[in-house]
Amino acid sequence: MAQINAVYYVSDSNEFIEEKAEKMATGLTAKPWQEMPEAEKQESFAYKGKVVSINEDPSYGEGSIVTISFPVAYEVPDFPSILTTTYGRLSYEPNVKLLDLQFSNDLVERFPGPLYGIEGIRDLVEVEGRPLAMSVAKGAIGRSIDSFHEQMLAHSYGGIDIIQDDERLFEHNWTPYEQRVPAGLAAIAEAAERTGRTPLYVVNLTGKTFELKERAREAIGLGAPALMLNVYAYGIDVLQGLREDPEIDVPIFAHSSLTGMMTRSKQHGIASRLLLGKLLRMAGADAVLFPSPYGRIGINPEEAQRVKDQLTMTTQMKRAFPIPSAGIDFQTIATVRQDFGEDVIINLGGSVHRYKGGVEAGGKAFIEALNSAN
């Protein structure tokens, strides 16, 4: 039977931690264990959560690191079942944080993982040997499709590798899919005649949950070379469903909107390394935007590195691009490259738009700074 080891930080006093850990293990699976007749206990024992270890970690201060093993009894494992099993009832506990889920290999193999990953995206943009440069089509909300075209043109002339829709650019009457995707691609093609380069346009996929697959197919039919999803606004299972659809055969970028309420507390919620790293890679994200450690809304540097490690470590799945975002400017580029290495997408949005010479000049300055930040 497949197994999941769930790792928790329990910030309660260590005095009764053994009892609490056992209640956590049984409460998520075979509750109420103590009240079961002996015959029922024997039937349920194979499916009962079991405490594997209880340790202290000085880096977390007071409290304990508790590891519980859960058998996976369902035939087709899915993220809703897994998260409900390992953290469903515990999410009401104010002093328990889920740090990691350690999956047995046979369980990992049942999830799709990235379709393109780092190597595939590099092939699309034809850039090797340095981090990729990404910017965002900001300020498009409420403005005409002609204005959007001009902004995409400026980004393309500036030499940006990847141009992403703003995550708040939804289906508006001033920038509907049917006009926005062709306008963006036309701007890229126009600039390519002069630059010889074709940046990757990442189209924000929005709409009602049960319409997303059809919306994705429509966008791809219009020529969209990549898509972005605000994953946790919909649910991680939605990302997996998109990735497993053979007709949705373009890279999918995962945005971390809404996850702050789940990750920010040290004592409660789900760790960024798991929520934004391991799970999104398993579900099929080719690249993941997450708060950089450099801005006011950023995660701490150690956790940012753990997110990167979960996305890029060698496993049976393709590696996914980390995209630390927010709080990055021209002065931070060298630091990002030093901290995250070559296999990172550096997302510079506001600084490119605010550049004194405009977006095109900002893009060129971005590439120049990136190339000089060795």
Curated annotation (Swiss-Prot):
* Top EC class for this record: isomerase
List, alphabetically, the InterPro entries matched.
RuBisCO, RuBisCO_lsu_C, RuBisCO_lsu_C_sf, RuBisCO_lsu_N_sf
Protein keywords: Amino-acid biosynthesis, Isomerase, Magnesium, Metal-binding, Methionine biosynthesis
Entry annotated with the keyword Cell inner membrane? no
The transmembrane residues are: none
Q: Where does substrate bind?
A: 138, 164-167, 255, 327, 349-350
Task: Please state which protein family the record places this protein in.
Answer: Belongs to the RuBisCO large chain family. Type IV subfamily.
- What's this protein's function? Catalyzes the enolization of 2,3-diketo-5-methylthiopentyl-1-phosphate (DK-MTP-1-P) into 2-hydroxy-3-keto-5-methylthiopentenyl-1-phosphate (HK-MTPenyl-1-P).
Quaternary structure, per UniProt, is:
Homodimer.
In its UniProt entry, what is this protein called? Answer: Putative 2,3-diketo-5-methylthiopentyl-1-phosphate enolase
